[in-house]
Amino acid sequence: MTIKEHKVVYEAHNVKALKAPQHFYNSQPGKGYVTDMQHYQEMYQQSINEPEKFFDKMAKEYLHWDAPYTKVQSGSLNNGDVAWFLNGKLNASYNCVDRHAFANPDKPALIYEADDESDNKIITFGELLRKVSQIAGVLKSWGVKKGDTVAIYLPMIPEAVIAMLAVARIGAIHSVVFAGFSAGSLKDRVVDANSKVVITCDEGKRGGKTINTKKIVDEGLNGVDLVSRILVFQRTGTEGIPMKAGRDYWWHEEAAKQRTYLPPVSCDAEDPLFLLYTSGSTGSPKGVVHTTGGYLLGAALTTRYVFDIHPEDVLFTAGDVGWITGHTYALYGPLTLGTASIIFESTPAYPDYGRYWRIIQRHKATHFYVAPTALRLIKRVGEAEIAKYDTSSLRVLGSVGEPISPDLWEWYHEKVGNKNCVICDTMWQTESGSHLIAPLAGAVPTKPGSATVPFFGINACIIDPVTGVELEGNDVEGVLAVKSPWPSMARSVWNHHDRYMDTYLKPYPGHYFTGDGAGRDHDGYYWIRGRVDDVVNVSGHRLSTSEIEASISNHENVSEAAVVGIPDELTGQTVVAYVSLKDGYLQNNATEGDAEHITPDNLRRELILQVRGEIGPFASPKTIILVRDLPRTRSGKIMRRVLRKVASNEAEQLGDLTTLANPEVVPAIISAVENQFFSQKKK
């Protein structure tokens, strides 16, 4: 067997940069906002070399200001005191609702795709203004004031958006907790944020199942005297929902008491708009703080320029407002621009795998933004449904949440986009607020597997994690950092600014540390390697787990792979791969004769040889564990921490598993590791 030479960003040498298909240009409602790569480079260089001039122009063009700012930007990454648009006054709710309602009240704002399609509805900007004003009035009547936090625990329904905008309207701070979190997780976030008001619903509906949302809230807040009011929306109208007198109030009853217009409160640009809790390396969640002016501008600019969004477009972001994707690209980005946003309550599999494509056909969606996890699911079991529907309205296909592998990128382009759409593989995070690395649709040529180029104002760099020195030029790999502030970056961690500094600004002084590994290829394009703690070092070789995972996933029988590094006395670390297989093929309990006579040992041997051939002998997994499924968070990401602990024989130290969407797989994984790994070591 010939082992190919290992190259820096080696996969970049196997793909070509692709220009936007002609269909993209033919279907544009108007001229593109950025016309080509040269135009992007000119704008990008100005945003880096003259950031105050660049963002001053953008802020005045895209946002309505009640009072002008006196300085565009102050502070530094070194000191952790970054501020934008100082002394400027504005309101997020006004920017997202009022100005569009006044100009075009009958234009669709929210397109609600309910769990049951018979419950679908459209809310115009005029209706949205009235509904937001009423809930804002309720909160104001309860004494909620500027600077207070309000917790929102709602499924992906229009009322979640209404609640967020209502909180922002009165200058308060919303703290959305994903409605799939446990009672204990909800309690932790409510207490940490000091939220005295919680907004929830009686029950949720998802995938044809009913979720006892109010019951979870009651359990989580039992004994929490901090919470004085709970506003409950009737999602199902089921009778007998427990309501605590003096604390719990029905949404529809309280809203009916309020006027349908409440003037918005003028906020400082640096006033917090929201908190959003994200997992920390210590296991305790941290409340990331985003401010009003800078965040809104980042949301608007990336939605406009990355997706080439026009006012007539329809954006379908298949993400929940419980996560940053829903905040930025289902709510604040499109609504700031006055663009219709699809709010999707259900799952891609309910009532069948044609759901996404029916939504696109029904509403003539022009943009579809989804996580690779959902795409892998559809590719595995639901691909045949795509061709049944007319998806020709699509112009841009986005990917979010994790790097999308080149093969899945190609499948997305061919099967979903019919080779007519631009693929926008976007790299960003809760803390960045909006896109960091992403192609500008129609202007920047794309490469399968690459997030491509930095967005305006993102002064991206690659740092050697050992020396801390920036790596100049192309064909380099290291950790991804940003060396100057940008408007939508998080300003702090709620009540723990020291944690903010320690996590993001102190690891590489003068830089914002993303926590991700990355490579910059020969063309200057960025390839995201995943979290730095998902990089293993075997005998001095730094290996990206995503690189090994991609190699294993190329096998025809493999559905998905997750690679972790565990301690090894000889090599420092060794590679362990967990592999789930396609339906109809070998499963983790397979025996001789299953799956066309492919035995477990034969399959493991094939996969190891494949990695050796595609990357090098040093990257070969020491063992491959065959499992039925992998543990995932509720946002769809693989929880590699669990896999690492189990393979390290530390199953009793798994820590908090409340964010797992499928905790039932953990015992099976422990058993598989015991049978396939530890038992072999004992022989």
Swiss-Prot record:
PROSITE patterns assigned: AMP_BINDING (PS00455)
Keyword entries, A-Z: ATP-binding, Cytoplasm, Isopeptide bond, Ligase, Nucleotide-binding, Nucleus, Phosphoprotein, Ubl conjugation
Pathway assignment: Carbohydrate metabolism; pyruvate metabolism
Top EC class, one word: ligase
Modified residues (Phosphoserine): 679
EC number: 6.2.1.1
Crosslinked positions (Glycyl lysine isopeptide (Lys-Gly) (interchain with G-Cter in ubiquitin)): 506
Protein name: Acetyl-coenzyme A synthetase 2
Organism: Saccharomyces cerevisiae (strain ATCC 204508 / S288c)
Lineage: Eukaryota, Fungi, Dikarya, Ascomycota, Saccharomycotina
Gene: ACS2
